[in-house]
């Protein structure tokens, strides 16, 4: 169970890093928002899901 928790935290960190870098780049590029809107929303949905997953797994680990 601990390795699953660690992998979920690692995935959350990587996703957070990619969103912190990617979203401003998408918003700054010309015509970036309209063409990459689905990608940004998918990344945000993945991030929210990982936050809940880490929270649930944390109750089993600690």
UniProtKB/Swiss-Prot annotation:
InterPro entries in alphabetical order: PSII_PsbZ, PSII_PsbZ_sf
Membrane topology, record value: Multi-pass membrane protein
GO biological process: photosynthesis; photosystem II stabilization
Protein's cellular compartments: Plastid, Chloroplast thylakoid membrane
Location, primary (coarse class): plastid
Keyword Cell inner membrane: no
Transmembrane annotation, as ranges: 8-28, 41-61
Subunit structure of this chain's protein: PSII is composed of 1 copy each of membrane proteins PsbA, PsbB, PsbC, PsbD, PsbE, PsbF, PsbH, PsbI, PsbJ, PsbK, PsbL, PsbM, PsbT, PsbY, PsbZ, Psb30/Ycf12, at least 3 peripheral proteins of the oxygen-evolving complex and a large number of cofactors. It forms dimeric complexes.
NCBIfam families associated with the record: PS_II_psbZ (TIGR03043)
Function of the molecule: May control the interaction of photosystem II (PSII) cores with the light-harvesting antenna, regulates electron flow through the 2 photosystem reaction centers. PSII is a light-driven water plastoquinone oxidoreductase, using light energy to abstract electrons from H(2)O, generating a proton gradient subsequently used for ATP formation.
Cross-referenced HAMAP family: PSII_PsbZ
Protein name per Swiss-Prot or TrEMBL: Photosystem II reaction center protein Z
